[in-house]
Amino acid sequence: MTQFDKQYNSIIKDIINNGISDEEFDVRTKWDSDGTPAHTLSVMSKQMRFDNSEVPILTTKKVAWKTAIKELLWIWQLKSNDVNDLNKMGVHIWDQWKQEDGTIGHAYGFQLGKKNRSLNGEKVDQVDYLLHQLKNNPSSRRHITMLWNPDDLDAMSLTPCVYETQWYVKHGKLHLEVRARSNDMALGNPFNVFQYNVLQRMIAQVTGYELGEYIFNIGDCHVYTRHIDNLKIQMEREQFEAPELWINPEVKDFYNFTIDDFKLINYKHGDKLLFEVAV
């Protein structure tokens, strides 16, 4: 049993047993298959904590880990909102939210790429500012990136689910706290928790720090009603030992990472389970 499997199953059980239904509301989300309202059971404010002795990834079903890393590179490295850039990597998870101009509007990578921070008399973006400050001002309590920009929310295809990171440097270790306003526990959570842990490992490597703690906070923590039956099946499955994530140690520049610099070794997992997408 991995740290992730244990915490994940605990949250799923809590939602199924104690979650509050939103069936009294006219919800925004619709089932992609038939256009009917996609309702949820939810609880508020859940936290997952990992000591980074193992990579946090689900083993009761397969997580598309390469796709998760490619999306991470698209947002954090390319700082792109162009879905075509993601398609070139063989990833199509954002196709349903693509606007006429081929982008997802002013969301995700668009916000990270804005040159809105001042550094040595120049304007830089949030990622470059973070990398500089972690190296040169490690004791700061202001190591924060933010994707939730009220000025741009109406211009986004989808407002960000994971919207904030806060980084801490203590005793030579880089700790990361992530905040998600909302998490679909069947599809989004295993993806997001893994990919932001990969981000922590990447940034620790290029800034020269050891890995510290990894914390993932969820505001609206929910399960879609059509996902409940398969989640019950998933929770009863055999759990495996955590795999090892290899990251090419030769990469010292954040912008030089490619998907070929990552390997997930001995990833044992349950069979794929299908969960319908709500849009």
Swiss-Prot record:
Its EC number is 2.1.1.45. CDD domains: TS_Pyrimidine_HMase (cd00351). Pathway: Pyrimidine metabolism; dTTP biosynthesis. SUPFAM superfamilies: Thymidylate synthase/dCMP hydroxymethylase (SSF55831). It catalyses: dUMP + (6R)-5,10-methylene-5,6,7,8-tetrahydrofolate = 7,8-dihydrofolate + dTMP. Pfam families: Thymidylat_synt. Homodimer. This is Thymidylate synthase. It comes from Bacillus subtilis subsp. natto.
